[in-house]
Amino acid sequence: MAPRRNNGQCWCLLMLLSVSTPLPAVTQTRGATETASQGHLDLTQLIGVPLPSSVSFVTGYGGFPAYSFGPGANVGRPARTLIPSTFFRDFAISVVVKPSSTRGGVLFAITDAFQKVIYLGLRLSGVEDGHQRIILYYTEPGSHVSQEAAAFSVPVMTHRWNRFAMIVQGEEVTLLVNCEEHSRIPFQRSSQALAFESSAGIFMGNAGATGLERFTGSLQQLTVHPDPRTPEELCDPEESSASGETSGLQEADGVAEILEAVTYTQASPKEAKVEPINTPPTPSSPFEDMELSGEPVPEGTLETTNMSIIQHSSPKQGSGEILNDTLEGVHSVDGDPITDSGSGAGAFLDIAEEKNLAATAAGLAEVPISTAGEAEASSVPTGGPTLSMSTENPEEGVTPGPDNEERLAATAAGEAEALASMPGEVEASGVAPGELDLSMSAQSLGEEATVGPSSEDSLTTAAAATEVSLSTFEDEEASGVPTDGLAPLTATMAPERAVTSGPGDEEDLAAATTEEPLITAGGEESGSPPPDGPPLPLPTVAPERWITPAQREHVGMKGQAGPKGEKGDAGEELPGPPEPSGPVGPTAGAEAEGSGLGWGSDVGSGSGDLVGSEQLLRGPPGPPGPPGLPGIPGKPGTDVFMGPPGSPGEDGPAGEPGPPGPEGQPGVDGATGLPGMKGEKGARGPNGSVGEKGDPGNRGLPGPPGKKGQAGPPGVMGPPGPPGPPGPPGPGCTMGLGFEDTEGSGSTQLLNEPKLSRPTAAIGLKGEKGDRGPKGERGMDGASIVGPPGPRGPPGHIKVLSNSLINITHGFMNFSDIPELVGPPGPDGLPGLPGFPGPRGPKGDTGLPGFPGLKGEQGEKGEPGAILTEDIPLERLMGKKGEPGMHGAPGPMGPKGPPGHKGEFGLPGRPGRPGLNGLKGTKGDPGVIMQGPPGLPGPPGPPGPPGAVINIKGAIFPIPVRPHCKMPVDTAHPGSPELITFHGVKGEKGSWGLPGSKGEKGDQGAQGPPGPPLDLAYLRHFLNNLKGENGDKGFKGEKGEKGDINGSFLMSGPPGLPGNPGPAGQKGETVVGPQGPPGAPGLPGPPGFGRPGDPGPPGPPGPPGPPAILGAAVALPGPPGPPGQPGLPGSRNLVTAFSNMDDMLQKAHLVIEGTFIYLRDSTEFFIRVRDGWKKLQLGELIPIPADSPPPPALSSNPHQLLPPPNPISSANYEKPALHLAALNMPFSGDIRADFQCFKQARAAGLLSTYRAFLSSHLQDLSTIVRKAERYSLPIVNLKGQVLFNNWDSIFSGHGGQFNMHIPIYSFDGRDIMTDPSWPQKVIWHGSSPHGVRLVDNYCEAWRTADTAVTGLASPLSTGKILDQKAYSCANRLIVLCIENSFMTDARK
């Protein structure tokens, strides 16, 4: 049959071993640790389940689970999920860590939203000169640089477990290493509390984007304590036995961990059947929820409800630790077919350990555990199997003596605790007592464990080993099938010696036994009435065997105490001969009012404290010491009444003579104290209902508690699930023998009375400690019935135990190597006097059971459970992958962050806007004419604008000199033939600007150099182009003088006869008509206008034009006319620019002869001639002054470089607008978007600056466009079609709705809505609907393509570009680019 398991139910068995400590110290430790543990912050909760990438479980220090961090681990969350916004003023940080790299790394860090400043953190530095530093970061609000508050130099920590604590208190920082103070450093800080902004982040194993080294290695504990005293309290040597983990390093403790095999066999039905008694619900400590979470149990944890704890420790540093990895498998074994039929009530536990169980002291706390599955126990008998457990192969036991019985009492009291109910859906109202038991007894080594003197038969109990009773109800329905046909299961062991306790303080031993459920063994039925007799002052056990029913009839009479022995030495000499048995001690009786013990019955659970059996670490027996002085009253027991002292027993046989010791003062026995006040009945809390187990989903917001569904039919047996979280404390109930005083008062009056099934009331609060009672009278002498031989004498004091335990290789304790600890036995001591009055009594009887409470709400999700088995693969313990959770609603807008750091160098800026028209310049001074020698002919200059004609010396035809005319300025000597000269107009130097207003005529400039001879064909062509409209009729001119002959011109003629002026003629083809009589000079004509060119974008001012060539009849030009409409370059522009040589050759047929060509790529100059091109030689370079604006492009079309099919070529730039384009391919979340937009815009010939349509860590999306142009300019595509009315309208909160019929083009002219190059029609933006950056959804500032990281994007199918959809950053989506300002220079 496959093993049966209940969902959410787990059988766990752990053994508790510890080092001796007094009971007051144990009690004090528990209180301190409970106080210190409240409100601590466990930072390992950041890791979560399932584990992140590069994080895994490993076996950690002491066998606990730990987390292994690889190089790629990235654990971080918003700090507000774990850390309070206002941090503790004083605090402590506890760490258990094992680095695997010499580079150190950050253990944890709380940073600002930009992950640049560490507010609080711990870092390990790299290894330098055999040391490392532990660095504490503590940065107060307002600082923009991480501050190192303290740094401690420690030895290299790599590849070994290290335990340290950092304490920040007042003006000091203290480092504790292995519970010892390492050093202190002064710490200056302001009185202002450390506060974290709401957008702060907390990281584990790294520090975000700060650039600090990541931690690689194993991390087991990382806890922040609000009380800075907590680490010191947990490390107190007096409290080490109560600690839940070792304070020192396991490697250096020297305590060998020997894990004993535990087997279970079915024993004879004659073995004792023990009925467990459920303890009342104990208050749940904060650590109960952590027992199966995979976390180490914090120090000082003593209380538990679902398991007993193995504590073992080094004698040097003394704190125990829980071993939760020693149990290899826990599974059921088929029971008796008769009792198992269908109900499964007879399932056994078969616990097989393949490892050695750590054992540094003898003893197992008996842990009765009652578990309930989904059973109705009203009609199910609970008799049946009994499970006994024992450990094997220890070589020697330990015998506690009288001076250590107080510690023994504390040990036994704690180990008997942890009786727990594990509620499922069970009602225990009808459970018949004493039927189904699984008990485990750990027997001593070779001899049965004894505690004090007894009658010749005794009870196996506390000191060496106690028993564990497990009552189970697994999935039982009220079938009525009896389960008492199963024989008990008994596990035995073969030790060499027993662990016994000698006579001692009865008060302490009574306190020990009252908290320990003792179990009878034999064939007697449970519930039989105890034998009559005097009160039982002290529970005892026999050294060798179980008590039989016949022997029980003779117990109850007191024996006389042995004679007083002399004080022995310290026990450090050589071992002496064996000591004979001492005199008979007092016998056990029935109805021992203070012992918490009754025949055939169990006792109450005690106060609920769980104390390890450290008291059993003792040496071999030494000589008995004298009776000590009366000690101070011990800490009151919670459920014990001390019985009256017994009469002295008969003298036992004399022991071997020991060294004589001084006689001690006899002690005085006190009377029994008054019974304590009965506690008030407490109200029972509601039972919690178990919610349906859901598949783990992605991390989402916590949902409301789920409702419990109806029970379905039994399904197929599935694999065992991981351990569930601890349930709430169950209600106290009367089970087994039906005790009403489950607090352990020892009442045995109702042992044999069957109890009616009724609801169980919750246990009332514990009463306050009462005043010390008066000294009692000496009790009556008991009957002089000889008791069994007394135990051996007490051991010597252990002084060098830690050094002697290093080489232990077998058994619980191997003292063969410690001969110096064994002293010779001493003489028997005299009986002591009555002791002091007893302390206040225990809590009163339990009230009547209350009615069952309502089902509680579903509990919170538990921590990850510890994996206690190696039989089941890890993947079977983990649930199936959950469905993705719902996306959470966008969070509120965060507060305005602090000023950012200085950014990187920006992209090249756009050209500046044209300046305003300058003020009208003043008239310049006349130029000084300096006649110089004629220079060499210069290279041909570029064509210039027609110059103003200042002097007309003559026409191209010879004209005789007119003597009545004034001589022109700077003309050649009269009568000498020369070429036509022209004088330029002196102008003001200005910057590039808009067309200016009409300026005043400048003064006459200096005479220019002679020009080259003109070609007639060129001249005719040029004059035809310069043909103007008909001028006004001129006045009749006077007869001209005979002109000189100009022999340098090819065309000349004789002077004509004077004629009358004729009427105005039609427009002629030539400038000069036939020669007529000279007329009067005509007035200047109106300015001429050229034929308007095709409209085009405004171009820069052209270079100077060719020289004006005028005929004799041309009048002086008028003032400059208004600027004409801009046009594309026409054939009349004699200077044209091409991109390169190929472009010039392809367009040669479009260029007329005489046109100058400038090549942009090579900066060369050519002139078009008849058969081709001729290259012109240019002079030296004259650099442009630094303060001059850059020259405009020679072409007036900024988009002419786009390929022919590009729709941008037809874009209309006449109206101001901002252009929106897309990158030429899709991109994932890891992209240098701004650089791509700039680069692709330049490649497309767009001169303005384009920015990515994305939010960034430095800028919100809504602020990319220049502020002055967010409201006035439309947003258009590259064809000029309007997409949005203005930039601000996109961020109105409606998602940026646009007309889907207007396409969005890429820089290379493709429509992204239809082109298959963008398979996912989704646009990245990473912004809220109002254009605010969302740091959790913008692919880590567009620097990652990780699948686990998301960014916001908008599907084009919605007709919006700001729709709020989250996509994985690994997707390749559309990236848009926006022109961030209107650039007029690029479009002139």
Swiss-Prot record:
Compositional bias (Polar residues): 240-249, 379-392, 452-472
Region (Nonhelical region 3 (NC3)): 733-763
Glycosylation sites: 243, 247, 265, 306, 324, 343, 687, 745, 807, 814, 1046
Start and end residues of each stretch annotated as Nonhelical region 7 (NC7): 1014-1027
Residue ranges of the region described as Triple-helical region 7 (COL7): 1028-1045
Keywords annotated in UniProt: Angiogenesis, Cell adhesion, Collagen, Developmental protein, Differentiation, Disulfide bond, Extracellular matrix, Glycoprotein, Hydroxylation, Proteoglycan, Repeat, Secreted, Signal
Chain intervals for the UniProt region annotation (Disordered): 223-250, 266-301, 371-795, 827-864, 988-1016, 1029-1133
Region (Triple-helical region 8 (COL8)): 1053-1107
Residue ranges, annotated region (Nonhelical region 6 (NC6)): 950-983
Region described as Triple-helical region 2 (COL2): spans on this chain: 619-732
Positions of the Collagen-like domain: 619-680, 681-731, 823-865, 879-927
Residue ranges of Sequence repeats: 358-408, 409-459, 460-509, 510-555
Residue segments, region Triple-helical region 6 (COL6): 984-1013
Record's compositionally biased regions (Basic and acidic residues): 766-780, 1029-1044
Signal peptide span: 1-27
Positions of the UniProt region annotated as Triple-helical region 1 (COL1): 556-573
Entry protein name: Collagen alpha-1(XV) chain
Organism: Homo sapiens (Human)
